Amino acid sequence: MTLALTAEKIERNRFTGLKVENSTFHHCDFSGADLTGTEFIGCQFYDRENQKGCNFSRAILKDAIFKNCDLSMADFRNASALGIEIRGCRAQGADFRGTSFMNMITTRTWFCSAYITNTNLSYANFSKAVLEKCELWENRWMGTQVLGATFSGSDLSGGEFSSFDWRAANVTHCDLTNSELGDLDVRGVDLQGVKLDSYQVSLIMERLGVAIIG
């Protein structure tokens, strides 16, 4: 299915479970739409000329797949996104505040599920997002807003973390190997259980004025 839509309000069940390829959605309103199991491949959701993205607020994105799509400036606020896959996408400036990636089993028990990989998340907003034990590798995190976010136990390996505020988020027990760690200062960040590779450790030690021999 290939489409070119502009400024359309998407009906709740229009794309549920469908596969949509190489389509263009400019200024489209997916708010409240049920996109459970929907696959978007090679689709454009960003209008470069007007620098505006699409609205996915309050959408149901359970097990939805976005592959090689442009999701720049998309509004995902308060969407239900358990099991979402965003792979090989552009998502600069996307807003994930209030997006739920979790399944609440009881008030004290939950698990998260999300696969956001090889994606440009520069200047995206993940404030207060809970993405624990998720696949978040090989992403670009330049200037990403993460105040109050928790990534505990997630795979953040191979990432680019320039202009990233490490003190703002919980990265305990994360895999950070093969990542460019930018301005990470170990004196102000809880790194309990974090995985680092030997090259990263040597750079961190150098910053602290410690010389590693051998």
Swiss-Prot record:
Domain Pentapeptide repeat positions: 23-103, 116-189
Key words of the record: Antibiotic resistance, Repeat
Xref: Gene3D superfamilies: E3 ubiquitin-protein ligase SopA
Protein origin, superkingdom: Bacteria
InterPro entries referenced in this protein's UniProt entry, alphabetically: 5peptide_repeat, Pentapeptide-BTB/POZ_domain
Signal peptide stretch: none
Gene Ontology biological process terms from the UniProt entry: response to antibiotic
One matching Pfam family: Pentapeptide
Function of the molecule: Confers reduced sensitivity to the fluoroquinolone antibiotic ciprofloxacin (five-fold increase in minimum inhibitory concentration) when expressed in E.coli.
Family assignment from sequence similarity: Belongs to the pentapeptide repeat protein family.
Name of the featured protein: Quinolone resistance pentapeptide repeat protein QnrB96
Gene that this polypeptide is encoded by: qnrB96
